[in-house]
Curated annotation (Swiss-Prot):
The active site is at E28 (proton donor), D39 (nucleophile). GO terms for molecular function: lysozyme activity. This is Invertebrate-type lysozyme 6. Residues 19-138 form the I-type lysozyme domain. Induction: Induced by Gram-positive bacterium M.nematophilum CBX102 infection but not by Gram-negative bacterium P.aeruginosa PAO1 infection. Its EC number is 3.2.1.17. It catalyses: Hydrolysis of (1->4)-beta-linkages between N-acetylmuramic acid and N-acetyl-D-glucosamine residues in a peptidoglycan and between N-acetyl-D-glucosamine residues in chitodextrins.
Length: 138
């Protein structure tokens, strides 16, 4: 029974994260490959407006042999599957920082996406989270 319950909970978290990814994508770019934009002194690129440091933290998905990290970041950010993999990997890497906050998977994903590894604990990310909830995610 315990194993079955764990499987159901794992499916629910994955499903919530998939819906949440769509809401974050919509909030950041209307889910379009928008290229790079200046964002508080550094560039944010693509579907999820990913910064270079975030791309490095998410494990540099899609980086090709011989490709510079910067070129891979710009390209990956404008490819929906690659960018989604990056956001999901970033969430998986830093979600443990939010243990004990009582926040659901989507709130953790959204607030960390907006505010960095401990974004779930920053009051500055509450407005972003409210915007995600306004898109129908929770």
């Amino acid at each position: 029974m315990f194993v079955k319950l764990c499987g159901i909970l794992a499916f629910a978290v994955t499903y919530a994260s998939s819906d949440c990814l769509q809401c974050i994508c919509k909030k950041e770019s209307e889910c379009k490959p928008v290229g790079c934009n200046d964002d508080v002194g550094s560039l944010s690129c693509g579907y999820y407006q990913i910064k270079l440091s975030y791309y490095k933290d998410c494990g540099q998905p899609g980086k090709r042999a011989g490709e510079s990290v910067e070129a891979a970041w710009r390209r990956c950010s404008d490819e929906l599957d690659c960018a989604s993999t990056c956001v999901q990997s970033y969430y998986n890497r830093y979600k443990k920082q939010c243990a004990g906050t009582g926040q659901g998977a989507c709130e953790i994903m959204a607030r960390n996406h907006n505010g960095g590894p401990r974004g779930c604990k920053k009051s500055a990310t509450l407005g972003y989270w409210n915007g995600i909830k306004g898109l129908g995610c929770s």
